[in-house]
């Protein structure tokens, strides 16, 4: 979940209050799972297709089935690699 912070100055007490606002966005994991499932349903090798997309940036590696292509384009490719690496290393 992506969060942003909003800082407000309350004039009456002159105190700084920090609010955390959650945006309703799917996590990288949720998006990858949805894309993986869509690719599998269409008979593609999901790992090869996702790797092809990450290396080339060409969204045609990802099927439009179940809106998978639009979903994966919401994430920067470097963010995908970062999340995959973090996940892989945390399991070792």
From Swiss-Prot:
| A Pfam family of this chain | IreB
Please report which protein family the annotation says this sequence is part of: Belongs to the UPF0297 family.
UniProt-listed HAMAP family: UPF0297 (MF_01507)
- Please state what the protein is called: UPF0297 protein TTE1249
Q: Which organism is it from?
A: Caldanaerobacter subterraneus subsp. tengcongensis (strain DSM 15242 / JCM 11007 / NBRC 100824 / MB4) (Thermoanaerobacter tengcongensis)
